[in-house]
A protein has these predicted regions:
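Conserved alpha-helix/loop element of class I SAM-dependent methyltransferases that forms part
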Residues: 14-33, 48
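Class I SAM-dependent methyltransferase Rossmann-like catalytic core
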Residues: 2-14
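A conserved beta-strand element that flanks and buttresses the S-adenosyl-L-methionine
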Residues: 98
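Short catalytic micro-motifs in class I SAM-dependent methyltransferases
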Residues: 101-102
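Conserved Class I S-adenosyl-L-methionine
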Residues: 42-44, 163-261, 265-270
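Class I SAM-dependent methyltransferase SAM/SAH-binding core
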Residues: 34-88
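Conserved catalytic/acceptor-binding region of the Class I
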Residues: 110, 117, 125-193
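Helix-to-beta-strand junctions that scaffold the AdoMet/dcAdoMet cofactor pocket
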Residues: 106-107, 120-122
């Protein structure tokens, strides 16, 4: 996806960062040598990974030049690649491929995940988080506003069904490809501030390509049509804040490590017997 607005996206930096950190905390790798973050955005997580594993070559990958301009100064010990993650391939087999809130932009997850797992070194890990809120009022209102205006012909080709499958589908696929799979869902009740904050949240992600497809005045009129609907769906609380429930899917899939050579096992066994004599 192109046309990202870093300032709009970062209006809600903390609630967007929380699931990314929770995914990273579940990655159990002591000293990976090659680490990639796909869809690194402004590089917040790439920076954290470079600090966690200072001996690794950590590379952030994104196709947005605007996002990467923000990322480059943030982690001088990280590398950056401007590439489309739909066609990306690593320069070396990866010990960790990490992706937070990016793969749902891509189709055909069966083919995609097979390809990414194929890029892992033995014992390597694929760690992914994707939103699963596409049937929520925040997204239903997008489709409703799109159909209710002269902009429909421009927007219709950009609308599609939920890109993220049911959790069991991912569990079955990943279990057939990997030695171990850890999969879970979390629903976050995000407390947002500001005027119509759910509209502002969505404008930083899912709404962005639709707005980019329209010229004025249609762009503003479509945004206003969506804003009215989403404001009704998410009214403010008595204290002025707004609650946005948000469901997210996580998984960590690990390839089997290389088998220990039989000669190594025999040597270890002889050493153990000698030590006990």
């Amino acid at each position: 996806m192109t046309g990202w607005d870093p300032a709009q996206y970062l209006k809600f930096a903390q609630p967007r960062l929380r699931p990314a950190l929770e995914l990273l905390a579940r990655v159990q790798l002591d000293a990976p040598a090659v680490v990639y973050e796909l869809g690194c955005g402004t590089g917040a997580l790439t920076t954290i990974m470079a600090e966690r594993w200072p001996g690794a070559v950590v590379t952030g990958v994104d196709d947005s030049s605007d996002m990467l301009q923000r990322a480059v100064p943030s982690a001088p010990n990280a590398r950056w690649q401007r590439k489309d993650i739909a066609t990306w391939a690593p320069e070396a087999a990866a010990d960790l491929i990490y992706s937070n809130a990016a793969l749902h932009w891509l189709p055909d997850h069966g083919q995609l995940l097979r390809r990414l797992i194929g890029y892992l070194a033995p014992g390597g890990v694929l760690a992914v988080q994707m939103p699963r809120n596409f049937s929520a009022p925040s997204h239903v209102a997008i489709a409703e506003a799109a159909r209710d205006g002269p902009w429909w012909a421009r927007i219709e080709p950009l609308l599609h069904e939920s890109p993220v499958a049911e959790p069991r589908w991912y569990l079955d696929l990943l279990s057939s490809l990997c030695a171990s799979v850890d999969l879970w869902q979390t629903e976050y009740f995000q407390i947002l501030s500001g005027e119509n904050p759910v509209k502002e949240w969505t404008k930083g992600t899912w709404l962005q390509p639709l707005l980019a497809a329209l010229a004025e005045p249609a762009r503003t009129e479509f945004e206003e049509a969506y804003a009215r609907r989403v404001a009704r769906a998410y009214p403010p609380r008595a204290d002025g804040t707004t609650v946005l429930p948000f469901l997210r899917l996580f998984f960590i899939a690990s390839r089997a490590p290389l088998p220990v050579p039989a000669t190594t096992l025999r040597r270890a066994g002889r050493a153990g017997r000698a030590g006990g004599a």
